Amino acid sequence: MNLIEFPWLTAIIALPLVAALAIPIIPDKEGKTVRWYGLGVAFADFALMIAAFWHYYDFQSSTYQFVEKYHWLPQIGLNWSVAVDGLSMPLLLLTGLINTLAIFAAWKVTNKPRLFYGLMLVMYSAQLGVFVAQDLLLFFLMWEIELVPVYLLISIWGGPKRRYAATKFILYTAAASIFILVAGFALAFSGDTVTFDIAALGMKEYPKAIELLAYAGFLIAFGVKLPIFPLHTWLPDAHGEASAPGSMILAGVLLKMGGYALIRFNIEMLPDAHVYFAPVLAILGVVNIVYGACCAFAQTNLKRRLAYSSIAHMGFVLIGLASYTEIGVSGAVLQMVSHGLVAASLFFLTGVTYERTHTLLMDKMGGIGKVMPKTFALYTAGAMASLALPGMSGFVGELMVFIGIATSDVYSSSFKVVVVLLSAVGVILTPIYLLSLLRQVFYGKQSEELHLDAFIPDVKPRELFITASLLLPIIGIGLYPKLITQTYDVKTVEIAAHARQVLPVVAGQQPSSLYSQIFTAPTLANAEVESLVNISK
């Protein structure tokens, strides 16, 4: 058999899941064998992913590759349909890297190690399935499977308020999943044919009411996971109580699932409805940035400050997706990858700091940079990446989003100025709360409660390896963005072009100011959009 025809994606998804099922029969008394087993499986799966994409993925194609489709449960229309394209491929690699490093970061877990590593592998498999599923029911199945391990990881291995945080997480995400199911079934059963194939759903014609309601339903569902204000309140609690490996995956992968689904379903599948909601996304993105930055500055808990920082950074994804430009959409994808790496590194280093100080309250810290200089240096590097220092990946992503929205020809100049200026306020606040974090934790007067006169070990080789594995790609992408953008540029060009195809056209020309001038023209092809926008004026 030709290796290119090998079911690579099925193997990549199945390996962690099958390996997790074998954990109960592995002979191990102290948990040492299980942790090596979990790390080996995660690394092997990540290596298999890299090998498959390196040898057989065509970076110049925007079409789906590694396509597999099997009838799984034909009675309910469920097919095992998986494929990868430029949008999902970089997020798959991010998922593989973050999960592998998170398992390595959990090296000291001694409480129920079999259950812990089993849940980590099941979650890993489900996350991969979300990014490659091409059947709506399969996507929903993977989306739901992923929730259970996250809930258990927080509720069993979390902090003092872990059960409250885990319950809040599952209530938010489970309730949001109902919107996926309802919106998906509305689209699947619309028209003469019933299908759950995502590509086929994107080609169907829908009544305007159904399309708008489905878009709103998907936006709510994926907005919880992204998260979008005001659906974000589960995130600070979850981060505040989750262990360091759990927070790495929460920030590094889970939030990206929401951004990915927003592109795949709302923009690619429902471009006509996106015309109505694009300005809303831009406004919500600005709110995320400003609100997240202001709330981050007010936090005294280290992990909660980073959680609100994540909310702010994901606001740039929304603005990029609303821009209708190639560079804006490309910047949104880059921002997702960049934030995954940066947030994972900061949450891991926060866990390293917590192991030494046994507190997350910044007002009880101070002066630990003197006894932990390596940790201080690594944390500073992560903070610089988070505040989008030039030469770091975050700078490139945010700059592309700013250029995308500023050069967009579908918004009025006044709207673009307001979006850019308010977003810039959030950018200015970011170094304030991050530098304040560094000052409170690593500088200042030494806290007597921490007993810093006693020996506190600095970062260890394992911890240094994990941090370096995250910081090196951050710097590499910052210095040479094409390292990652070449994997999805062709796809983002297609996404932006596909979204723009449904924009009203006057005399064969692309609109110069869609939401201010073009809808007032008498020759519009879309009179209903004209009416809506005029009413909003």
UniProtKB/Swiss-Prot annotation:
Subcellular locations according to the entry: Cellular thylakoid membrane
Listed GO biological process terms: ATP synthesis coupled electron transport; electron transport coupled proton transport
Molecular function as annotated in GO: NADH dehydrogenase (ubiquinone) activity; ubiquinone binding
Entries under Pfam families matching the protein: Proton_antipo_M
Role played: NDH-1 shuttles electrons from NAD(P)H, via FMN and iron-sulfur (Fe-S) centers, to quinones in the respiratory chain. The immediate electron acceptor for the enzyme in this species is believed to be plastoquinone. Couples the redox reaction to proton translocation (for every two electrons transferred, four hydrogen ions are translocated across the cytoplasmic membrane), and thus conserves the redox energy in a proton gradient.
Family assignment from sequence similarity: Belongs to the complex I subunit 4 family.
Protein name (record): NAD(P)H-quinone oxidoreductase chain 4 3
Source organism (scientific name): Trichormus variabilis (strain ATCC 29413 / PCC 7937)
Taxonomic path: Bacteria, Bacillati, Cyanobacteriota, Cyanophyceae, Nostocales
